[in-house]
Amino acid sequence: MGYSYTEKKRIRKDFGKRPQVMEKPYLLSIQLDSFKRFIEVDLTGEVGLEAAFNSIFPIASYSGTSELQYVSYRLGEPVFDVKECQIRGVTYSASLRVKLRLVIYDRDAPAGTVKDIREQEVYMGEMPLMTENGTFVINGTERVIVSQLHRSPGVFFDHDKGKTHSSGKVLYNARVIPYRGSWLDFEFDPKDNLFVRIDRRRKLPATIMLRALEYSTQEILAIFYDTTKFDIKDGVISMSLIADRLRGEMALFDIAANGKIYVEQGKRITARHIKQLEKDNINTLDVPVEYIAEKDLVVAKDYISKETGEIIVSANDILTLEILAELTQSGITSFDIIYTNELDCGSFISDTLRVDSSSNRLEALVEIYRMMRPGEPPTKDAAEGLFHNLFFAEERYELSKVGRMKFNRRVGIDGDEGAGILSKDDILSVMKTLIAIRNGDGIVDDIDHLGNRRIRCVGEMAENQFRVGLVRVERAVRERLSLGDLDATMPQDLINAKPISAAVKEFFGSSQLSQFMDQNNPLSEVTHKRRISALGPGGLTRERAGFEVRDVHPTHYGRLCPIETPEGPNIGLINSLATFSRTNSYGFLETPYRKVENGKPTDQVEYLSAIEEGSFVIAQASASIDENGLLDEELIPCRHKGESTFLSPADIDYMDVSPQQIISVAASLIPFLEHDDANRALMGSNMQRQAVPTLRADKPLVGTGIERRLAIDSGVTIIAKRSGVIDYVDASRIVVKVDDNELLPGEAGIDIYNLTKYTRSNQNTCINQKPTCEPGEPIVRGDVLADGPSTDMGDLALGQNMKIAFMPWNGYNFEDSILISERVSQEDRFTTIHIQEFSCVARETKLGSEEISADIPNVGEAALSKLDESGIVYVGAEVKPGDILVGKVTPKGETQLTPEEKLLRAIFGEKASDVKDSSLRVAASTYATVIDVQVFTRDGVEKDKRALEIEEMQLKAAKKDLTEKFKILENAIYEKALAILVGAGQDEARLLQMPRAQWLEVQIDDETKQSYLDQIITQYDEVKADYDKEFDIKRRKITQGDDLAPGVQKIVKVYLAVRRRLQPGDKMAGRHGNKGVISNIVPVEDMPHDEFGVPVDIVLNPLGVPSRMNIGQVLETHLGLAAKGVGEKLERMIKYQRDIEITKVREFVQKLYSFGDAPCHVDLNDFDDEAVMRLAKNLYKGLPVATPAFDGANEGEIRELLRMADLPESGQLQLTDGRTGIQFERPVTVGYMYMLKLNHLVDDKMHARSTGSYSLVTQQPLGGKAQFGGQRFGEMEVWALEAYGAAYTLQEMLTVKSDDVNGRTKMYKNIVDGDHRMEPGMPESFNVLLKEIRSLSINIELDESN
């Protein structure tokens, strides 16, 4: 493959053996595509906003004389861009405008005659928009809507696993789940009667449902049973014989015909007997009367006496000898009996009809009405209306396309299309299928199969929520349409947008699936957007989810990651999308496979869902292929119907596209994943998401090859949109001169990229972009121009490469503790910047408005030294706990003054006492620097001096920004003009002496060139007009007042930056789940060092490896040592052999990229000498290698790289103790491991309390750092002090240090006076106990007399 100039700067050596069949899909497409489908105008009207409108409109009035029709919708432009929304704390959204048509029909004319039509565009609230990175900005914070995994609509058959009834009998059930509407359940009881439930209410016999659908008993029996015909002739009863029905039965009488006995009485009828009967063509059998008496035969039809017209026997009655005699008397010569048996044709429906109390449709409807609406008197219309609305009304019930497809496939109806409501046949098919399963024909469904669970993405959930809003509006509109006078009414008067925007706002703001984005680092952002949750509205709940739902299912293969899931109560309920997975049009997850034809894998890739995959045989990606491209083993491990098996190449239909297909993005970042235990890999993939971006990002030496892709897709880097040459670079912008072949007609050909500088993320880490390119460099589309947080030259870089040794060191690495060298801290390897935002709000109160000012009562000069005259802290001030950031005073109510205070007020004026100090102060344990201040003032409130200063600064910055942009474009235009003029024969030197503006006025003879010049003049005018317009918009935005919440006058936001160095107590981890806490930071000279005197950075405990079974970390250490070693060797070659020939460098570098079993993708013949030297210099810090999961470097390749670096093949070095200078007695495993600093910093957790707030009832200190609380001294701790006999210490703990109110106040005063005595009193808890006992009506009093 060809590398661009940028990519040639540093290339990762790939150890992957398998060829890449397909590129990894764009990682955020699940979010972006879903929302795009929702928001874009869809002319078919099947998805998105269009579908929501079509499902509600037209809304007709009750009388039908008028209706409101939907025509089309459009979204406006957002008022503020994403960054402005974040600063101002508003939602990034656009206004939704819908064109509606009000049609009024003429009452007097024939039906359908239109009297009047009025069209109007109506505002329907704001619709939040998705940013280009798949997030939403809601009230200024970035949020992500997590996709939900829920049970697909359709029909499901299941059983209770024998748990319901004490006998352990398995009871089968069927459940029809619509997309919206009532659930319909059918279930068997222990007596094998079939019952129906609607919406999980009280159960009714299932035949009530059939009667309500207008079936009679006779029709019901005809639908579910075959019949056997009996004839009566001359007093002899004969039955028509279908021989196959006798199989396995016991002969109750001699089975004989034509004088031949086939089966004797009491013998079992076998297949041989049946064959004999069929051979002799026996169609009827004479039956003795006793047979009828013994067998409970059930009549299939109603039989009516020909003489009297009375019913002799009803359908489903049991035939007795008396009834038989009556039938014979009334001249009926033949009758039908339903055919049932114990084995495969149970009498379930027949038995159910006997427990069914209803006999006609009306009774059935009333019974259903009573069950759904207990206590309401039923009327015929109400009962019919309710039943119709349950399953047969489109506005109340919708199976959806998915539901209909799943339903038809499960009950065997042809085709995937059909109505969204249920039909009679649908209900019958469900009952028939359920009875077939009970009869032993068919199997129940696996609810955890991914063919039965589907993904609901953002777009679909937003659409549902929007529909909810529209339904609320619909009722109001229908009322208003029916009120009568519509002569002057416009659509605008009918629609109230409040309920719609409220529903949308509620979803985006407070739904369980709308989550605060995890913005620790680029990986955590991407993973959060690819998360799939089974929780949320319409999903599972943590408490009710069992083991099966959480478990890994065979259908997860390539769809959901089996590794990445949280530890704790949510395990298995929150999953991550596998790398190549996507959703299909029905919302089921599908994964790509390579087609295999006649044992030869092709390059054709097909996506299969879990349902489709079941019928194919699929081989692993690791199946070996010979030089002819054929699968070359006799038996190949493959998967079929969820089981692993071995089959020959000819039987194989598909094979995996990649070994990383089964895992998620986070898991595929772990090198040597295949050597780690799954539990530790889970911790590894979860902890990478908690890594804090370091000050100087450092790409991993040992990676997996997906780092670059992740950094680009995450959106934290800046990617070139078009090819060109870098024209200008500074810290905040990059200007690219676009190549001519990518220019649009009439365009200046300049791309300007603005960088984000020192912004706060959701997790208070720092977002900052730094350019990676230099002026004059050629770039192509897709190149990385600037690194974001945790990226290094376009590679994801979550941590640092550290030199580690596995050895014990004086017990400082006991229990996973980590010992680090002072050098790590000095070099700022793990120093991170954290930005905190503090807001101070000045409100309007009953007593007057709060004021932000520097005039604060009872505060000394020193405390105000960092504030300006407006009472706001300066940018750049270094603040410590307790410092005032924003001075604010609040009016307080009038209090009764003492004479002394009155005197003081008379002398010193009013101010001091009628306001109280409510300033914003720095929190405890925060030492920081103020980096930014924002002031927001309500419209109509006068801005203070600081607000005006900030406004002026912003205006200057905006003007400078736009002016520079304009200048760049202007220069580009003048360059073009100069080229045209010189080309037309004008003298260049003369032109350069003229003012540039006059170039555009020069007239030339060549008409074509003159037209080009005219185009350029037009372009210049457009650019100038754009500049003026943009500056005007910017100015208006900056100077206008802010839209603040009611009652808020002013908001001041102060941003503080804290630099956190590595220190004992911080949590660190590798990528293999090997986590630990720093126990000590040791001087460099005391650390173990190698024979060249190079000390190690980190010492880890070797006992952390064997029991955890994450050997990947050891392999990573060895490979890291080799990668670093070859880099150092290259550096020595170039630096210390000044006159070294470039060919030797080229040879060595080429050898590095070519060795090993993997196909080589790097050919240095395509690189010029300068590019080779640039590449070599970028490899000084080590050769970055990629070892993809399940396809990585093997032991031989690691040994070979160690040899190339002139290092021992064992990967172990002889170390010397830095303190004693004595060598350790055996070689130690030393190497480079990629270590992360996790967002669990000791500074955020360490906390100590002196005195503070107390709980209101118990008067005990509060708990937790946020409340400045104390340490809990619990029951067991009390036992410990009792055991030691430390009586006074215990007394102190339970009284003055806790809830003895008087004692603690006195103690405090004593300590201030230097007197350290204590007098314990009565703990408040005792009083609480007394009160609680009294609340039980037991009078208890404390006798303190003696």
UniProtKB/Swiss-Prot annotation:
Coiled coil, from the record: none
Enzyme Commission code(s) on record: 2.7.7.6
Molecular function per GO: DNA binding; DNA-directed RNA polymerase activity; ribonucleoside binding
Swiss-Prot/TrEMBL keywords: DNA-directed RNA polymerase, Nucleotidyltransferase, Transcription, Transferase
Alphabetized Pfam families for the sequence: RNA_pol_Rpb2_1, RNA_pol_Rpb2_2, RNA_pol_Rpb2_3, RNA_pol_Rpb2_45, RNA_pol_Rpb2_6, RNA_pol_Rpb2_7
InterPro entries per record: DNA-dir_RNA_pol_bsu_ext_1_sf, DNA-dir_RNA_pol_bsu_external_1, DNA-dir_RNA_pol_su2, DNA-dir_RNAP_su2_dom, DNA-dir_RNAP_su2_hyb_sf, RNA_pol_bsu_bac, RNA_pol_bsu_CS, RNA_pol_bsu_protrusion
GO terms under cellular component: DNA-directed RNA polymerase complex
PROSITE patterns assigned: RNA_POL_BETA
Any one GO biological process: DNA-templated transcription
Catalytic activity: RNA(n) + a ribonucleoside 5'-triphosphate = RNA(n+1) + diphosphate
Source organism superkingdom: Bacteria
Database matches in Gene3D superfamilies: 2.40.50.100, 2.40.50.150, 3.90.1100.10, DNA-directed RNA polymerase, beta subunit, external 1 domain, DNA-directed RNA polymerase, subunit 2, domain 6, RNA polymerase alpha subunit dimerisation domain, RNA polymerase Rpb2, domain 2
Subunit structure: The RNAP catalytic core consists of 2 alpha, 1 beta, 1 beta' and 1 omega subunit. When a sigma factor is associated with the core the holoenzyme is formed, which can initiate transcription.
Functional description taken from the UniProt entry: DNA-dependent RNA polymerase catalyzes the transcription of DNA into RNA using the four ribonucleoside triphosphates as substrates.
Similarity annotation: Belongs to the RNA polymerase beta chain family.
Record-given protein name: DNA-directed RNA polymerase subunit beta
This protein's encoding gene: rpoB
